[in-house]
Amino acid sequence: MENKKSIPPVPAAAELPPEQTADHKPYDDGFAPFFAEIQKKPQYDSARIEKAYSLARSAHEGQFRRSGEPYIMHPVAVAKILFQLGMDNECIIGALLHDVVEDTPYDIDYITREFGPEVALLVDGVTKLGQIPLSTREEVQAENIRKMFMAMNRDVRVIIIKLADRLHNMRTAKFWPPYKQREKSLETLEIYAPIAHRLGIRAIKEELEDLAIFYLDPIAYKEIEQNLRLKQVEGERFLADIKTQIRAKLEPIMKNVQITSRVKSVHGIFRKVYIKGKDFEQIFDIYAVRIIVDSMIDCYNALGIVHDMFTPLPGRFKDYISTPKPNMYQSLHTTVLGPGGIPFEIQIRTWDMHRTAEYGIAAHWKYKLGKGGKDSIDNRLEWIHKMLETGEASTNAEDLVRNIKGDLSSDEIFVFTPNGDIKTLPSGATVIDFAYAIHSAVGNRMTGAKVNGKIVPITYKLKTGEICEVLTSNQPGKGPSRDLSLIHI
């Protein structure tokens, strides 16, 4: 590590430098209202959190983000996200300090002395590697991801801080150059959104996915967003009526019933329209109603009542209560026909299931779940241990990261044309699929393909981030048959 001597002591709040930017104008970094909320919660050590903020603000003084904002606004924003998740003192302190070792003269030993080994582990886990002799940006990225996963294996809060860090960076990605927007969006879809899903942190997962799609395929994003906006306007009265009807049936016989509604996320629609080839009108869960009740028995009773009220669609019922998802998600899902034959999804769960569904692993800290919460954490992290055990045989970081991406992979990949346009395909798609995704005429005249500049067989399975060039004949009908079983689209 480079020499980081002569480090000044952590400044007290009263010793903070004047609130100035490069133009010497006062600025609000958002800490004051955030700290006021912290002080209302007795479980937080406000003195330690304020001390961490004071160090971060002093250390980042004179540093600015691409937006022109003082850098301190970023760690404060990350800490706010973690506070909203209900994370603990160490996690919030780690968030405030997460870039201090990477970008300032302070080292990890100093963090250990001032804030303890637990915070130091979290900060070190999200700190990128220093100057090491690596030849490519891909190697640097791979080494950083490996370092993060190793730390995550010791303390899952490392990745929770990193998810919040990535979320705020994606929220402000409009200030990045286009190449970085694309690179970080791909990484977000390949690594960070799937991790959020595995950990059950739904809100972060969905926002990361939507932001990544916005930068990877802005045309598709805007088209879906426009359609969803119309659906939201059309469905406002419809959903209000549905909720009123269900409430009238359930509230007289059940206590603590909550009924809410939502319109599906952009990425959720994107996967069905652009990956699975469905028409917008064929998506049955654009509208959804959520019913939260006190007990598991109430869940099944509520299911029977809504099936009496509305016609259930065959094959659309899923019992994730008796068979939870791998990320411990539990709910009953059913799709029914409402007034006017409009389909909508109903999700039914208990309050405990709802906390787990919304906050995932973070619910352990937010709701102090005790031993049961610890068991839930162990179950959720089993995949990390297995993944790292499998990766121990990898000869280098890039091999390990390929294994990680493969383990996390969803059912979609993103492949580029030589001009930089992006095509979204199902996982396992071949270059034939890519050709037909461009246009049927291209697929019909296809004679071969290059991936990353090298000739590949037409059965080659594409991977996210690759550049595919389709080679064609001037004569139509010379390409591979679209009836080939290889075709995924």
Outline where the language-model segments fall.
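N-terminal acidic, proline/glycine-rich, low-complexity intrinsically disordered segments
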Residues: 1-15
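Internal insertion modules embedded within essential enzymes
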Residues: 9, 26-31, 48, 108, ...
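Short, contiguous pre-domain boundary segments
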Residues: 13-42
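Short, mixed-charge amphipathic alpha-helical segments
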Residues: 37-52, 107-119
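Alpha-helical phosphate/pyrophosphate-handling elements in metalloenzyme active cores
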Residues: 51, 61-95, 101-110
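Active-site flanking loop/helix segments enriched in acidic
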Residues: 53-81, 130-148, 419
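Short hydrophobic/aromatic beta-strand micro-patches
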Residues: 292-294
